[in-house]
Amino acid sequence: MANILNIFNQFPKNYDLTILQTFFAKPFKQENGKWTKPSLSLVAKDNNTGKKHVCEIEDPEYIWFLAKDPDKLTHHYDFLPKDEVEAIQCPNRELEKCIAQATGNMKFFTNNIANGEYRENAKLHTLNQVFFSDQNIEDHYRFWFNRLFKNEIHSVRKAYLDIEVDISDIVGDFPEPGEAPVNVVTYINDGVINTYILRDPKNPLVQEFENQVASGEIERDLRKLIEFAIGDETRQRKFNIFGYNFNVKFFDQEIQLLGSLFRQINTEEPDFLMAWNMAFDIPYLIQRIRNLGYRPESIMCHPDFKLNPKAEYFIDTRMENNYAERGDYAYISAYTVYLDQMIQFASRRKGQSAFASFKLNDIGAQICGVQKLNYHHITTDLAKLPFLDFKTFVFYNIVDVLVQVCIEESTDDIGYIYNSSVLNNTRFSKVHRQTIYLRNKQIDFYFNLGLVVGNNINKTREKPSEKFDGAFVADPNLVNDSVKLKINGIPVFLCDNLVDFDFSSLYPSINREFNLSSPSEIGKIEFEDDKDASSAIIEDIVTQDHLTIGHRWFGLPNYSELVDQVSTLFASGRLSTENEFKVYNKGKLVKPLEVEYNECIPALTRFGSMNMNAIYGERQMPGGL
């Protein structure tokens, strides 16, 4: 396939490039009233040289497919062979207009625009003849990149970041974004602990600390601290931190500190930069730069990014307190991917209830046995710590980042996320969302088989306000106590070794086992007098007419037949056993005991009618019963 989307067209096809990052910038209205064009930036690594490259595309295009013979399509198809569709390329911002033109629905399209009902045009993607038109634009370019270049997975370089803020003069209990100066930042990359410190004329301990750094005392103390916090050489080698170097920089002006920090990041170009709870660090730095009178893009972005550079961080407020479901992401125009390490950790372990807290200290203790530095023997107020013991304050910041390193070295979450992103052609913000990455993988897998997938027609459908009331739930009070666990001899509603016949799980399991899907269904074979009894049996069960249910569905006698059989049984006179009773004493057969019966009471009266109180007999066994 030709590189018609102009993705890294300076490289030949099948060149050893691997996609790292994608940025899509939506159009926005400028001060002059005109709208900008959207843009897409792709970052890839040359695996032959290790160098990274950026591909900036203004007004990115989309390739979708239209059925050649739409009249043959009687319903929505999950896929069609490539030879039955034709590819259509158009600007992504005009995708729905292009679909409307190609399918003869321009009137529908223009009416929606005129009425301000822009979302209604999304229904154009549900047309039977339209295929592969509903993929996210970033994932779409990842898909075509994967078909143009090798896109093989290699090891990645990881960096770590944490900031501290001077909160001694803030108004509330917690600083607002950009409210107070950033006084300490630690950035760890390539075996070097880089610590940036803001000088403070109000705090003489900062100058004292600087003198101790110059004398080498701080580095010696730091190595002792690492051994105390993490362990001996064996433990340090386990987490790949043995022999870390220490580099401290002091600044008189805060903007110089921040500028130097991001210059170093953009010079070293680590593949990933992580912070624990990045939703605080990066938005705070962005706003702090603004408060200091500078544009964040001029400080944080790499100079190679010329087309619409951005320094933004998006917080998923819908899932703000559910870390496993949060979709935060950073849009910082650079060769480095900024990721929230806490969200990645929680998302990868979604559904596991082992972690009651995702605080750095708690996760560090559970995962790798490394915790934050405890300063409470000095003060319980972090705002006072730099004025009481500045060295401990700095070391507290450094140990925080070391805990991050130990967690990642123990879990390799970022390696997993990177692999998933490359293998599934999925942007990092959605790499944990199963419906999205499986859909992207399906698109790629089917395309390799010569098939073009259809669209997800459920996206535009209104979701029902109430769930379908189709399940039959038995009264739990009818569950036998024999299967229940007992507490102090009292059975509770808790079962061990429970088998849950959950249809919501059963149906997908059956589909997977028999490789079923809607496109593989040719039709339904109906036999003569064959009835679909699934709904009827549920309706009968709900009526609780047990005799009717037993007769109709399980071949048991109805009421009249039951009475006849019972009356025949109990009107037959004396009951006798077919074999004699055998009695054993200490394992030896002894003389059988004689069993005496009273005459059975006839079940039928002299009038031939049923006496309901007479359907039983009496017998007297030796010893009495």
Model-predicted regions and their roles:
Residues 1-488, 492-499, 503-504, 508-589, ...:
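The two-metal-ion catalytic cores of nucleic-acid processing enzymes
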Residues 624-625:
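Long, K/E/R/D-enriched contiguous segments that form extended
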